[in-house]
Amino acid sequence: MSDFEKPGWGDRDEGSLRARLRPLSLPVRKVLARLKAAYRLIGSAVPHGEARVFYGYRRVQGEKTVTIGGLVKVRALARVFPNTTHGFNVLYLVSSGLPRGAVALAQAAKRKNVRVVINQNGVAYPGWYGKKFKSLNEPMAELLRIADHVFYQSEFCRMAA
């Protein structure tokens, strides 16, 4: 079996009950994500002037918590731009650490004239995620279309995205 034929991370639970139920839960999760996004932005005026940043999570992990991947960047940024869960004017998302419902949140933010900033640091590929790599890339591609600004971590990331 070649490396390309070996199961990727996304193929490991193929055939399990969880994998079979996943398509049924997707519409429910999308509705919940939209409701959650609407709640975050309901009744809040978008402030002008100083940047008020929301990173997509209620809490940004502190210094004493083990943080991995792209969310390390968020922790560093939050020291300068504290996480603001309501009344924010910038939504900053990291592609390797997207919150659930990231696309719905970004769409709702755009409707409220909130600036959407994406830190793009890679894409899924078959060797990593198996046959399901496209399903992981779809929300990232949508976020890139929505974004007002994208920080690409490398030229390769820009080309691959």
What are these regions (language model features)?
Residues 59-60, 96-99, 122-125, 157-158:
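Short, solvent-exposed loop/turn segments at secondary-structure junctions
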Residues 64-67, 129-133:
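Short, solvent-exposed loop/turn segments at secondary-structure boundaries
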Residues 90-92, 106-125:
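Active-site proximal beta-strand in glycosyltransferases
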